[in-house]
């Protein structure tokens, strides 16, 4: 039997939809056939017709067939929308975002593959004995219990992750400002020392001692300011390290939540999509750690 690359459960769902569509298509074709049959019985009673009479008959038949085909195409489009709505509603319960590729709907190779699949399914169903078995309806997703707790935990971790990102951004700004101010103070001190060296040859001997004392006092004051800034920088670096530890803790909790989710719905279609989301989260965390490394002061 031809395959569509789906698991057994989803393939059975596709078969059920194709049977439904085939049934609707058959009913509509019977309606079109009846239009022609009614025309034969009601209008084709004379042996000869004029050109005007033939045109009138064909125009009337065209209008009826056009209406029937248009109605079926519209109904088919609405039916497909309802089917997509069911799938999207189930995905949203697991906080998933599904995507569709409209261009694939006109892929001739894939369309032929679906046609072969339908032919194989019809052949297979004709060989199977007809059993009076009522197919169970799709059970709604469980909104309570372990699944609900896991979803709430994921939301909490995501919120905490956003808070940590905001906190890290604030610490980064503070650290950058502190480094800039420290650089400015060091440059000012160097300029003052350079200016002192340039002026030593031009000042009188009796004023040299006073100037050196003034420079020493200024240097002491600058050094004190630099020490204060250094302590402030150390505090910011400690906050940065704490934030990193918190980020690692959140990453570990996200990893644990991912494992719990994998155990919970490892047999469902949502498993692959959820795993992709968690992988993207870990990639975002890795990217954030790389960005943090750029702001760490060099030894």
Curated annotation (Swiss-Prot):
The keyword Cytoplasm applies. Keywords: Coiled coil, Cytoplasm. PANTHER family: LEUCINE ZIPPER TRANSCRIPTION FACTOR LIKE (PTHR21635), LEUCINE ZIPPER TRANSCRIPTION FACTOR-LIKE PROTEIN 1 (PTHR21635:SF0). Regulates ciliary localization of the BBSome complex. Together with the BBSome complex, controls SMO ciliary trafficking and contributes to the sonic hedgehog (SHH) pathway regulation. May play a role in neurite outgrowth. May have tumor suppressor function. Belongs to the LZTFL1 family. Self-associates. Interacts with BBS9; the interaction mediates the association of LZTL1 with the BBsome complex and regulates BBSome ciliary trafficking. InterPro entries: LZTFL1. Residues 96-296 form a coiled coil. This is Leucine zipper transcription factor-like protein 1. GO terms for biological process: negative regulation of protein localization to cilium.
């Amino acid at each position: 039997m031809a395959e569509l690359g789906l698991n057994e459960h989803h393939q059975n769902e596709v078969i059920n939809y194709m049977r439904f569509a085939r049934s609707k298509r058959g009913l509509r074709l019977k309606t079109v056939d009846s239009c022609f049959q009614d025309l034969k019985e009601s209008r084709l009673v004379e042996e000869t017709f004029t050109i005007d009479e033939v045109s009138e008959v064909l125009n009337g038949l065209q209008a009826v067939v056009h209406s029937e085909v248009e109605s079926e195409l519209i109904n088919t489009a609405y039916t497909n929308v309802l089917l997509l709505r069911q799938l999207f509603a189930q995905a949203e319960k697991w906080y998933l975002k599904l995507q569709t590729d409209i261009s694939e709907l006109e892929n001739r190779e894939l369309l032929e593959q679906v046609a072969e699949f339908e032919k194989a399914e019809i052949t297979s169903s004709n060989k199977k004995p007809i059993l009076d078995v009522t197919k169970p309806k799709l059970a709604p997703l469980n909104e309570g219990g372990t699944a609900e707790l896991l979803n709430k935990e994921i939301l909490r971790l995501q919120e905490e992750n956003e808070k940590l990102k905001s906190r890290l951004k604030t610490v980064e700004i503070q650290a950058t400002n502190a480094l800039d101010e420290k650089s400015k103070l060091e440059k000012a001190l160097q300029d003052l020392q350079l200016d002192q060296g340039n002026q030593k040859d031009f000042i009188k001997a009796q004023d040299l001692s006073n100037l050196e004392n003034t420079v020493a006092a200024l240097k002491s004051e600058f050094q004190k300011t630099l020490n204060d800034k250094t302590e402030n920088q150390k505090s910011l670096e400690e906050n940065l390290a704490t934030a990193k530890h918190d980020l690692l803790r959140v990453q570990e909790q996200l990893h644990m939540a991912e494992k719990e989710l994998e155990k919970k719905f490892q047999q469902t279609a949502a498993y692959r999509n959820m795993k992709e989301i968690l992988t993207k989260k870990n990639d975002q965390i890795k990217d954030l750690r790389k960005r943090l490394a750029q702001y760490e002061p060099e030894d």
